[in-house]
Amino acid sequence: MTIIRKKHPLIKIINHSFIDLPTPSNISSWWNFGSLLGLCLIIQILTGLFLAMHYTSDTATAFSSVAHICRDVNYGWLIRYLHANGASMFFICLFLHVGRGIYYGSYNMIETWNMGIILLFAVMATAFMGYVLPWGQMSFWGATVITNLLSAIPYVGTTLVEWIWGGFSVDKATLTRFFAFHFILPFIITALVLVHLLFLHETGSNNPTGLNSDADKIPFHPYYTVKDFLGVLLLLMAFMILTLFFPDILGDPDNYTPANPLNTPPHIKPEWYFLFAYAILRSIPNKLGGVLALILSIFILALMPFLHTSKQRTLAFRPITQTMYWILVADLLILTWIGGQPVEYPFVIIGQTASIAYFAIIVIFMPIAGMIENNILDLD
């Protein structure tokens, strides 16, 4: 068996990636989220495949086809709720994975980090298009509002929006193409994940100390396969509790009303995992400015390697920057809450303050804190 594992051209690749991979001996449970994201992706592709067998991407029948899946297809309700809540679990794991990367300075592996940002954009695009497919009120109005943001682009904006819509409003053509893209994107994401792993295995994993761990590596299997399996069990348990006991808790009640272009819902808002970005978008009165802030709220992650001023890699031994980090986490939770609130006092001013704080912490306060710590520890 050892010979096949190490000699066979295909199995050899799997062996070097998941079995004999030299891994730091001290990586914590925060390093579990990569494998959990892989599991989420597999769950989403499988449940999505079975949903696609029964779904029709036509404005006249899309809503009814989802109802048909839940009522008439064997375990259709389960597949539908696994897929809907699977997206939420996916984003929870994504945010924790990115948060771990920021905390432990993993962004210094620039290729892996940039690939991760591209993956984040791709997953967000996929989730947005998936939310449109049930063709409920929030699906329709969410699609209208978010795609309409592109009209803020000077000169080509209006033409671009109509090109994406396939007409003069969100209609049958839009739904059909969103379904096509929603179906193909997860497979593109899978390919990008392999590139992400390829870049990661060029440098090897980071670890909580941020120090070089070449002197103390252990094989991935059995140590981290077992550790990852514990993470898988915990995730599946949380996932099953969410799906079987509270399937609609993260959804919007408006989406149980069929799409109606003549009736606008009182509060148009995206799914919970986009609310922080939506709050940043809304906090700027100018349309183009809002769109730029929205894109920058994610793209700012790409600047992190260049904003790193500390001589230490991780935040493990840097209490000042640690404080900044946890303020940033609290700020993102505030933005998420604000994104779901109506546009009125005091939510507007809270959202604007939190948006300024978000960019200020990343661009100004964390780099300054790094320099102060260098000075205190006399690392200059």
From Swiss-Prot:
Heme b b562 binds at H83, H182. Its cofactor is heme b. It is found in: Mitochondrion inner membrane. A ubiquinone binds at H201. CDD domains: cytochrome_b_C, Cytochrome_b_N. It comes from the Eukaryota. It is a multi-pass membrane protein. Binds 2 heme b groups non-covalently. GO terms for biological process: mitochondrial electron transport, ubiquinol to cytochrome c. Gene3D superfamilies: Cytochrome Bc1 Complex, Chain C (1.20.810.10). Heme b b566 binds at H97, H196. The chain crosses the membrane at residues 33-53, 77-98, 113-133, 178-198, 226-246, 288-308, 320-340, 347-367. InterPro entries: Cyt_b/b6_C (IPR005798), Cyt_b/b6_C_sf (IPR036150), Cyt_b/b6_N (IPR005797), Cytb/b6-like_sf (IPR027387), Cytochrome_b (IPR030689), Cytochrome_b_C_euk/bac (IPR048260), Cytochrome_b_N_euk/bac (IPR048259), Di-haem_cyt_TM (IPR016174). Keywords: Electron transport, Heme, Iron, Membrane, Metal-binding, Mitochondrion, Mitochondrion inner membrane, Respiratory chain, Transmembrane, Transmembrane helix, Transport, Ubiquinone. GO terms for molecular function: metal ion binding; ubiquinol-cytochrome-c reductase activity. One of its GO terms (cellular component) is respiratory chain complex III. Component of the ubiquinol-cytochrome c reductase complex (complex III or cytochrome b-c1 complex) that is part of the mitochondrial respiratory chain. The b-c1 complex mediates electron transfer from ubiquinol to cytochrome c. Contributes to the generation of a proton gradient across the mitochondrial membrane that is then used for ATP synthesis. Heme 1 (or BL or b562) is low-potential and absorbs at about 562 nm, and heme 2 (or BH or b566) is high-potential and absorbs at about 566 nm. Belongs to the cytochrome b family. The cytochrome bc1 complex contains 11 subunits: 3 respiratory subunits (MT-CYB, CYC1 and UQCRFS1), 2 core proteins (UQCRC1 and UQCRC2) and 6 low-molecular weight proteins (UQCRH/QCR6, UQCRB/QCR7, UQCRQ/QCR8, UQCR10/QCR9, UQCR11/QCR10 and a cleavage product of UQCRFS1). This cytochrome bc1 complex then forms a dimer. PANTHER family: CYTOCHROME B. This is Cytochrome b. The lineage of its organism: Eukaryota, Metazoa, Chordata, Craniata, Vertebrata. The gene is MT-CYB.
